[in-house]
Amino acid sequence: MSYLFNNNSLGPVSEGGPLNISSYSSNKYVSGSPSFLQSNSLVAKFAFLIMVLILFILALRLGAWLLTWVFTPSSSPILINGMINAKQMMRIEQDPSAPGSKPIIRSVNENAGLEFTWSVWMFVDDFTYKQNEYKHVFHKGNDNINLSGDSIGLNYPNNGPGLYITPHTNNLLVIMNTFDKIKEEVTIKDLPMNKWVSVIIRVSNQHVLDVYINGVLTKRYQLKSVPKQNYGDVFVSMNGGFSGYTSELRYFDSAIGTNRIQSIVDAGPNMKMIGGDMTGTKPQYLSSRWYFAGTNDMYN
């Protein structure tokens, strides 16, 4: 067998002659049948369409999530993001189409039942102001403050909840509507003067209403029935409110835990004045009474 080398051939000389390098470029050696090539092209197109469809669905879901995140009301809105004069009435609209509204989402219904939390900071500098009346802190419901009789200053019938200072005393009154009783009440005694006080109203396990003062569980009350929530607006300082300041009114659609409660107390009130100027120096906050008071009235 002889070998022939030239520019166009490589390999042994056979009866068929040398195998030219140029023959590797021939369609006979590298091209498939037309039907095979066409089938590959269809598979590629189908795979591409599937990939585009998957990307479109992912983009659509992401867009829907972003729109929901942007336009859905917060589950824990800050209704008063700052401090107001407690004699200054404020109405917080619940109609999402109203300018400046801050809608409140209905409570989370856990396995044990309905639950939610309200948090507010109060500073009272004069208990003799409107001493013959209930002094309104805030309530959620209708606009119907009683202006006569023994219950001047109380809203009726909706308090979901309502917070007031009672006449002739320095006591706090929490009112909660329930389905079986129009008005269930919890009293917190001896609200201090000239100090910031954190008041947290928490409903858990559907029937348990807790009131925390400066992070301390001060009263636990067993509601007779399920709390009755409403779609009314939130009203602050109606009928002249009280003498002092209100700060950082906030709602949570769940029963917040003790760690979250403590973080609210540690953060303190928001001292940014809304709608006016604060006179005098910064008041001290966190009355020590609530840290060292007796525990006899904690659950009664």
Protein language model annotation of sequence segments:
Residues 1-300:
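Extracellular glycan-associated modules
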